[in-house]
Structure formats: C-alpha cells, structure tokens
Amino acid sequence: MSARLSRQRLDRELALRGWTAQDLVRASGISGSTISAARHGRPVRPSSIHRIVTALLRAPVIDGVAELLDD
C-alpha cells in the first residue's frame, strides 16, 4: 500500500522552515530516494509519510516566510 503527498504542499512546508530535502532526510531518518519520490509526487509508504509529517511538525516555521512565498 502506498500514498502520495502533494508536491506543492511538501515544497511549501520545506520552504516555511528554511529546509532543503537533505534537511528533511536528516530529520525524518528516511532515505534521500524516498524523499525525492515524495517531492516528485510518486507513491511512498504510509509509514514514510508519517515520518515526514512528524519531522515537519517538530520543526518551527520561520516567522515571515509565508508572506514571501507564492501561493
């Protein structure tokens, strides 16, 4: 079983934290290839999605960044 994350939403969440994909790899403990798959809209395991979301929720959003991002 697998699921897909929204590419745009994941990229936005990374930007809000000032993170790169490599930062997400380190914070989530997931392989770079799995993070790449998620960022390109390919299916990933639900357990990987859980780890991605958990890592993002633990990281603070940088104040003022949202206003700088295009919607």
Range-by-range predicted roles:
Residues 46-65:
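DNA major-groove recognition helix of helix-turn-helix/homeodomain DNA-binding modules
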Residues 1-27, 66-67:
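A short, Lys/Arg-rich alpha-helix, primarily the initiator
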Residues 4, 43-46:
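Generic alpha-helical scaffold signal
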Residues 23-24, 41, 58:
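Compositionally biased non-globular segments, especially hydrophobic aliphatic-rich helices
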